[in-house]
């Protein structure tokens, strides 16, 4: 939340240079405050689990949020009861004439398909186009980030020889960008994907800025102009047991899956997971909400 100080206080310039949110008394006295409208486009089959993960993070701020859950009308969800979707979700057609302060587009287990092979690709493209003029800032996660980078900037994805699976160390590349306010220079984030986007392709698009990457896991955080689009290739929203559940699920299916790296204590799946990403996950979501949604959105959408 902002701190209110005199506009002539010498510390103001220093704080602003450090991306500390300061507000003059004049602005504070005239500021209107309302709940922020946040849409979550949930593409995951485990919808209720994903809901809890994201709501836990975006709810960890002093901001009041009015959350709208969305699902794809052009896709039949087989892993969630229709009653749940009917009761708690809307479709794009339901909200396309509204505006939102923020939009989160989740990952989806469709990355081995080309984008055009995904059955809801045309609908997703319409939503991503809509977000450019009707949403203050959109946060794309994992496959959602790959889809956004491809649709908006033509950045391709590439198959990996082995699944990127585990918790990896990342390095901050742009320390003074507000999204990374409070981040350590090195931080951890989970990844769980069969494809990647490449650093050279990101750096080849002048509108994009690479914020954080990993020697082993590659690109993690990317931002577009003015923070209108944020892309997170990892899963900072994951709960403690999510990678464990994915590992056990794939083993039960008889798939050749390695133990997630840097995740279990002593890398032993019989021991408990070590959570090393929670604090930076909270920072990522709170910084996005604070700096790119709350501070930038108009009072009247």
UniProtKB/Swiss-Prot annotation:
Which GO terms fall under biological process for this protein?
L-methionine biosynthetic process from homoserine via O-succinyl-L-homoserine and cystathionine
The metabolic or biological pathway listed in the UniProt record of this protein is:
Amino-acid biosynthesis; L-methionine biosynthesis via de novo pathway; O-acetyl-L-homoserine from L-homoserine: step 1/1
Q: What is its main location?
A: cytoplasm
Site, Important for acyl-CoA specificity: residue positions: 111
List residues binding substrate: 163, 192, 249
One Gene Ontology cellular component term attached to this UniProt record is: cytoplasm
Q: Where is this site: Important for substrate specificity?
A: 192
List the Gene Ontology MF annotations in alphabetical order.
Answer: homoserine O-acetyltransferase activity; homoserine O-succinyltransferase activity
Judged by the first EC level, this protein's enzyme class is transferase
**InterPro entries named in the record:** Class_I_gatase-like, HST_MetA, MetA_family
Residues of the active site are 142 (acyl-thioester intermediate), 235 (proton acceptor), 237
Q: Which reaction does it catalyse?
A: L-homoserine + acetyl-CoA = O-acetyl-L-homoserine + CoA
The cross-references to Pfam families, in alphabetical order and at most eight, read:
HTS
Q: What is its EC number?
A: 2.3.1.31
Q: Which UniProt keywords apply?
A: Acyltransferase, Amino-acid biosynthesis, Cytoplasm, Methionine biosynthesis, Transferase
Key word Membrane present? no
Any idea where this protein resides? Answer: Cytoplasm
Role played: Transfers an acetyl group from acetyl-CoA to L-homoserine, forming acetyl-L-homoserine.
What family does this chain come from, according to its entry?
A: Belongs to the MetA family.
Descriptive protein name: Homoserine O-acetyltransferase
Name the source organism: Bacillus thuringiensis (strain Al Hakam)
């Amino acid at each position: 939340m902002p701190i209110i100080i005199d506009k002539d206080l010498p510390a103001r310039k220093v704080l602003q240079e450090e991306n500390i949110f300061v507000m003059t008394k004049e602005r504070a006295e005239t500021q209107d405050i309302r709940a922020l409208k946040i849409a979550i486009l949930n593409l995951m089959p485990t919808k209720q689990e994903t809901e809890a993960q994201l709501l836990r993070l975006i709810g960890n701020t002093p901001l009041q949020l009015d959350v709208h859950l969305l699902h794809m009308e052009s896709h039949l969800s087989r892993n969630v009861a229709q009653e749940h979707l009917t009761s708690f979700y809307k479709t794009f057609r339901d909200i396309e004439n509204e505006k939102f302060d923020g939009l989160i587009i989740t990952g989806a287990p469709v990355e081995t398909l080309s984008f055009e092979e995904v059955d809801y690709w045309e609908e997703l493209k319409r939503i991503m186009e809509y977000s450019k003029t009707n949403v203050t800032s959109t946060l794309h996660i994992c496959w959602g980030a790959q889809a956004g980078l491809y649709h908006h900037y033509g950045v391709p994805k590439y198959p990996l020889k082995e699944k990127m699976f585990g918790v990896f160390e990342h390095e901050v590349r742009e320390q003074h960008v507000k999204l990374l306010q409070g981040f350590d220079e090195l931080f951890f984030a989970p990844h769980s994907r069969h494809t990647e986007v490449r650093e050279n392709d990101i750096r080849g698009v002048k509108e994009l800025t690479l914020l954080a990457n990993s020697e082993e896991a590659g690109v993690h955080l990317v931002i577009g102009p003015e923070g209108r689009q944020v892309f997170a290739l990892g899963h900072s929203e994951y709960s403690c047991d999510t990678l464990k559940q994915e590992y056990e699920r794939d083993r039960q299916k008889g798939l050749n899956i390695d133990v997630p790296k840097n995740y279990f204590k002593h890398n032993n799946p019989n021991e408990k997971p070590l959570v090393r990403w929670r604090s930076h996950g909270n920072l990522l979501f709170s910084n996005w909400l604070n700096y790119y949604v709350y501070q930038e959105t108009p009072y009247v959408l």
